[in-house]
Structure formats: structure tokens, C-alpha cells
């Protein structure tokens, strides 16, 4: 090596001569920095940072920095995957756009490594305080040969001219005009002179694979990230456009759905009631004894189907739901007065008045319809039998609002039918003296099955006149005779003892008795507040909450000048041209996201929410004596006896009903049982029945639910693959809990 100079001054004064030792040019300050050879001096002007660079995806976390994943919301996208995608795409773009620099390497291995690393993102960092440097050194013996010395490593190159295409866009390198404007030091290819200050500049290559690749990695330009974020903005714009297209398509679909609501609607008299009469050759069925649980089967769903089939017979269940349910009136004329057996009677109503504290308004209504006006004549406090008798003598009708609360037979019928409809089923009874009427024309918010148990009644029923009147969610006010003039009923005729008439929700109806015979009918009602509208009332607020937490655009402020964009009143709004772009289209996109969220993630949980609501409102099951004996309720229990309920391997267990309980998830690691075993027979008369259930017992519950109505021994349950993931102790504790809350039958 040459002799090291002691000062910068002496180094500057030394003649520019060529040396055989390549290191001497560095010591003499004759070597040209690689940074100066290939890159201009960094600009001293403040660098503009695109706002997109500063945006970060915010995670939902609590004060302990624990990431939370919403149970119903989409999982937040991780930055890593998106970043890698943009790096790959943008790098490929750079390869196609950057100038072609033809440099022939003598080291073939280094060439292969460089080709390999061209697809990777390498950061350019300039740190003036670092000690590592990279230099080009001219070979003394060969003017066409240049050696790159980087951190102690040497790579030989042959000098070639840089060939640039005029048609290709410059990416990362400055144009010739920019180099002239920057007053760069001209590069002398013969002497490779360099300013000593440039010696301190260096390039730090960030290795992607290992340290050996560091020497050959390609230097990326400073504009790489700007280009990347421009691509991200373009993709974001494309995504916004796609959302707009989807929103437009869904808006069209929504409009088509709205138009289809009126298609096929048959108004008023054009609808026809269907009357089914019993064939004269069909033998009468024996009278039903409701005290003997006539429809009960091992499977509660089968029990429900039997009871409902009995109520509408001879129409079968499937035909009813296909042809009549919530669409047309069905009249069944059986010519069998004893068909409903001992379901209810006037004598039974007298017993209930005598033995129970029935109050006006709460349990009993007294009504009269005379000269086109309905009058309510309720008293105060308890309705005593003798007072009710006087009202009947005065041509008033008596309505028992909730007979299922006090009468076991009506309770049984309503309770078992609940599993057919999946919602609360209640009842009313109407006792009307001969030659009178108890109510004005009106419609109800429920589907009504009128069972004529005594006397006869003359009915008139009118169908809805418009789609707006179809299937209302609230009862109507009373209509007058003038209101009904000109409207032709879809059904008008007598309903005799043993007959049934089904009146869909929203059909106006009115009835009067025969001048010589009183009338008593039981109305079994279902479907109250049980519609898709009620479902959406529960799901949409939850979906809005989830979407608000996960979509920051929904949390943005409303556009400025909104009040000048539009309104209901036709005014000259100064910014009306911006209404669609800045308001309507944005709202449409949010509605599209809301619709997708509900459809993709919240429908299943909404079923659980409805089941939970059903468990709170539904009637409790009316158990047979055998079911009581095998359940926690007991029957004729000897409190001092030794016959305790024991759980052994041979003990058989079974759920008490298919839909008496529901296992619900509160979170990923917590669940509970909602049930109706202890519900009041008065609508929502007791608090909701909820019991915490161990998460370890889900598999055991699943086995019991899937095997219903079959009995399974504990040995069979514990031997199944589903339950072997938990210990027998955990499974047994979960099963015992089901017995303790009353939803499990146990047979030793």
C-alpha cells in the first residue's frame, strides 16, 4: 500500500498520478464515490411525505393492549399481507419501467445473485455518521476495468455506456437536465476524481436473505415508496368504484324487490275464501279428551304437528301452509258438534270466575256493539260471577283474555302448538248471548283460528284492499258501518259448533249470534310481533354497531353544505348538484356494506336472538305425570324416601322437549342456557330464565340435542368421540346441571 498522508492539504497538493496499488487512490482522495457516480447529491429541500404513508390500520384494543376480535365483525386485515402484495406488484412495475443499464460482471455468481434480488424491496439509507463506504477504483493496468470496493469486498466491472430509451419512463434516476441543474461534479472516466468530502458518504444495503447477498443487492430509488402509495391510492379508488357499482346494482335489486311487492297482490273481493266440508261418508272421530294429553308423542315436534292438524282437519298441515297461511281465509265445516270435546265451555268459564281472581281489563272484558257503536263496560277490580251474569243478561259479550293462564286444557293446546310456529301462542274466549254482537268490524295483528265450541255465529270477513293493509303489525281501530259500505266480503256465513275458521292477520271481520242461540268460541292466536320486520328491528341496530366499529368511513362527518344539497320541499338548493355524489352515493355504499354484513355474519346469531325471545315469552310445557316423575319437578315425591336420583353408567337421559331450552353463546369462552320450564302462564309474568352453562359441557349438550327424542345412557354419551375431548367429570357435571334446571329427564 502507499504511504498514508497526514493532512487533507498535502493530499490536495499531490499530483494526480496513477498507482499500481488500488488502495492508494483512496488514500490520495482520487477514488470516486459510488454514490456520486450513480446518484445525484440529495436535495436539501424538505421532502414531501404523502399522507397515505402516515395512515395506519388501527386495532381495537383495551387499556392492556390486548387485541380484541369482534364476535360478529369481520377480522381486521393485517398490514403484512397487504404490504407484501403491493411490494410484489410495484417491484414488477419498476422492472418494466426503469432504464436499462448494461453492466457486464466478471463474477457470474454475483450476477445470478443480483438477478435473484431484483424482485425484492431494498431500502436506501444515507447516514453521514457511519464508517462503512463504497468506492469505484480504476485499474491502473486496464482503463476499461473498474473495481467496486464495498465494505472490504471487491467486485470487478467493465466500463460500458449507459443506454437509455427515450420512450421509457425514468423511475428512481434523474434525467440529464436535472443533473445539469444540480451542478454536479463532472465524472472524468480517465482519472475518476472525487471530492474528499464525498468519501464519508456511503450506501447501506439492507440484506433480505443473508449477509452474503448484501454485497450484490440492487439499490432502489428514493421514489419507490411514493410510487407504492400511488398504487395503493389507485387500488383504493378502484375499490371505491367497485363498491359504487355494487351499491348501484343492489339499489336496482332493491327497487325491483319493492316493485315486486305489488305484483300478484289480489285486492278485496277478488280473493276467495276456501270452504272445506266433511265428506258424508267419513266417520266422525271420537270426542277428544284434553285431560289425557291426546296429542303427546315422544317427539315434541310431532306432538305439535298432531295438535295443529287436529285443529284444521280435514285440511292437512302442509296444504294449509302452502295455500292459506297469511293469505286466504279457510273455513272448515265438520257437521260434528262434539269435535272439540271438552276443550272449553260456558260452565268452565263460570268455574274460573269462581275460583280465580280475574280482574276487569286484565283478564275480563265486557263489551257491547249496538247501533254501530262498540262500548266497553268494564267494572273495577275483580269480575265476580254474578256481575258477569248480569252483563250477559243485558246483551253484552264477555271476553276472557288469557284462558291459557287458568285452564289446563287450553294451556295444553296452545303450548304444544308453539313448537309448530316457533313463537308464543295464546288464546281468547268469547261468550256472546243470543241476538247480539260484541265488537265492531276490525282487523287484528295476529293470525286467528276460531274454534266454535258452543252455539253458532254469523261471520263476515273482508280481505285487505291494498298492499299497505296486508299483514299489519298493529290492530286497527273500529270501523263503522259506513266504512264498510261498498266493500264485498270474501266470506259470509254461519260457523256451527265443531267448525273452524282461519282469519289471516289484517283481514277485517265482524260477527253476530243467532237470535235464539248463544255463541262461545275459542280464538287461538299466533304470529304476534313475529315477522321479518321484527327480525330486522333486532338485527339492524346490532349490525350498525358492528359496522361502525370496523368501518372508519362510517364514522366520518357529514358533508359540509348538506342542507343546501336537497330536501323534501322543492327549493333552489345551491349545492343540489353535489347531492348524489357527496351524499346519496356515500349512503348507498354504507347500506351495501350493512346489507353484506347482515347476510354474511349476523343471520345465524339473529336466529339465536329470536330463540332467546321465544324462551322468555312462551308458555311453559304442560308435563305428563310420567314426565314430572322423571324430571326434577317430581310426582308424588316421598321426601323421606331413599329413592334418590342417581347418575351411573347405565342411567338413561333425554331432553324434556326439543324446544324447551336453547344453548346460546355469550362469547368465545362463555355460554348459557335459556329455557321456559319455569315460565309463568301469564305472558312474560316472570323474569327470563337464564342459567350459566360450562363451556366444557357443549359437546355433551350437542349429543343430547342431536339424539332427541332417543334415550342415551351415560356410558354411551361418555364413549362418543365428541365427548372424549373432555373428562367424564366435566361431562357429568354439565348433564347434572341440565337435570337441576328442569330440562332433562333421568331414568335409572
Swiss-Prot record:
Segments of skewed composition (Basic and acidic residues): 94-110, 194-203
Catalytically driven reaction(s): N(6),N(6)-dimethyl-L-lysyl(36)-[histone H3] + 2 2-oxoglutarate + 2 O2 = L-lysyl(36)-[histone H3] + 2 formaldehyde + 2 succinate + 2 CO2
Cellular compartments annotated: Nucleus
One Gene Ontology CC term in the entry: nucleolus
Keyword annotations: Chromatin regulator, Dioxygenase, Iron, Metal-binding, Nucleus, Oxidoreductase, Repressor, Transcription, Transcription regulation
EC number: 1.14.11.-, 1.14.11.27
Region of interest (Disordered), residue spans: 65-135, 160-264
A Pfam family per the record: RIOX1_C_WH
Biased composition regions of type Acidic residues, renumbered to the chain: 163-193, 207-264
Cofactor: how and how many bound: Binds 1 Fe(2+) ion per subunit.
Annotated ranges, domain JmjC: 399-543
Disruption phenotype: Attenuated response to heat shock stress and reduced survival after heat shock and oxidative stress.
Ranges of Polar residues composition bias in the record: 124-134
Residues reported in the UniProt entry to bind Fe cation: 442, 444, 509
CC cofactor: Fe(2+)
Major subcellular site: nucleus
One of the record's GO molecular function terms: histone H3K4me/H3K4me2/H3K4me3 demethylase activity
BP GO annotations: negative regulation of DNA-templated transcription; response to ethanol; response to heat; response to osmotic stress; response to oxidative stress
Annotated family: Belongs to the ROX family. NO66 subfamily.
The protein's role, per its UniProt record: Oxygenase that can act as both a histone lysine demethylase and a ribosomal histidine hydroxylase. Specifically demethylates 'Lys-4' (H3K4me) and 'Lys-36' (H3K36me) of histone H3, thereby playing a central role in histone code. Mediates response to multiple stress stimuli, including heat shock and osmotic, oxidative, and ethanol stress.
Name assigned to this protein: Bifunctional lysine-specific demethylase and histidyl-hydroxylase NO66
Protein species of origin: Caenorhabditis elegans
High-level lineage: Eukaryota, Metazoa, Ecdysozoa, Nematoda, Chromadorea
The gene coding this protein: jmjc-1
